[in-house]
Amino acid sequence: MVSLGGEFAWAQQSPTVTKSPLTSTSDLTIAVLKEIQDIEERAVAIAEDFPDNLYNSYRPKGDQDVRTAAEILLHIAEQNYSYASLMRTKQQQEALIASGKKPDAKDILTFVSKQDVVVKVKASFAAVREAIQDNPDPKKIEWWLYVIAHSNGHFGNLVTYYRDNGLVPPTSRQ
């Protein structure tokens, strides 16, 4: 091996391996649930705050192929329910269906009112939390992370909608 010496000596040192602060499934679950709570709070803040006159009408550049704020929020809710279902065991899914508590995707995606959107978004995140708590299997982490990434991606879209209209999103006010 060639000695790098001098200012590059650090490059030859073995990296220090540090233990992850997540030492158990419980720690991982808690960390994921915290991230889900964070994006839920931001999504609900927008669902409650986005101006009524733009809520289900504004589309960037008037493009009919682009979702309105209401449609984005309902899409987040529908996907949350879908992935909450995938986080559950088959037995848990069957019990949910039998109880009549599994909502229909078409019903979730139907715009009724701003308040209805807020209720659906909140309920969908509650379904995700419940699914994780009922089945905290770390093998399901891809679904957990999908909820976080998907919701955050659409949160970014919604922030852009605020900015496009000369408004400040609730998460940027202080």
Residue ranges of model-derived segments:
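Charged, amphipathic alpha-helical oligomerization/scaffolding segments
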Residues: 38, 42, 120-123
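Second-shell loop/turn segments in exported
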Residues: 22, 26-34, 57-63, 104-116, ...
